[in-house]
Swiss-Prot record:
Name recorded for this polypeptide: UPF0102 protein Rmet_3430
Xref: SUPFAM superfamilies: Restriction endonuclease-like (SSF52980)
Similarity field: Belongs to the UPF0102 family.
InterPro entries, per database record: Restrct_endonuc-II-like, tRNA_endonuc-like_dom_sf, UPF0102_YraN-like
Gene Ontology MF annotations: nucleic acid binding
Pfam family, one: UPF0102
NCBIfam families: PRK12497.1-3, YraN family protein
Length: 134
């Protein structure tokens, strides 16, 4: 059976990730992995900074700036998924490097790099659960 063509949303997301990756590389970060997935989470980009910090990057794109723009679209549930995937990835390493979670937010005509966008320590306080269903 032939593979289904990627949806417009999937293509737009991949283009946003390409743009974020190129931008971060120009800033001196080195790509480690792209689209890391595990049960319960995913990370768009994993990068390494010059100081050896491992940087987990969530890329968000919005077609308009309504409702707070791309950065504001990162829900608590999405943060938990990124943190879960980061924890899973870190468990595969022999040594734990310094790490942080950044966001690259793409709005029309604007790219914003938010360093330390949310705290990896939140994993410890959340207990890994999703919380009550809404």
């Amino acid at each position: 059976m032939p593979a289904r063509p990627a949806s417009s949303t999937t293509r737009q997301g991949a283009l946003a990730e390409d743009r974020a990756l190129a931008y971060l590389q120009r800033q001196g970060l080195v790509a480690v992995e792209r689209n890391y997935r595990c049960k319960g989470g995913e990370i768009d980009l994993i990068m390494r900074a010059a100081d050896d910090t491992l940087v987990f990057v969530e890329v968000r794109k919005r077609g308009g700036r309504g409702f707070g723009g791309a950065a504001a679209s990162i829900t608590l549930t999405k943060q938990r998924r990124v943190l879960r995937a980061a924890s899973h990835y870190l468990a595969t390493l022999d040594r734990l490097p310094p790490c942080r979670v950044d966001v690259v937010a793409l709005d029309p005509g604007r790219l914003e790099w938010l360093r330390n966008a949310f705290d990896l320590g939140a994993l410890d306080s959340e207990g890994g659960g999703e919380g009550p269903a809404s």
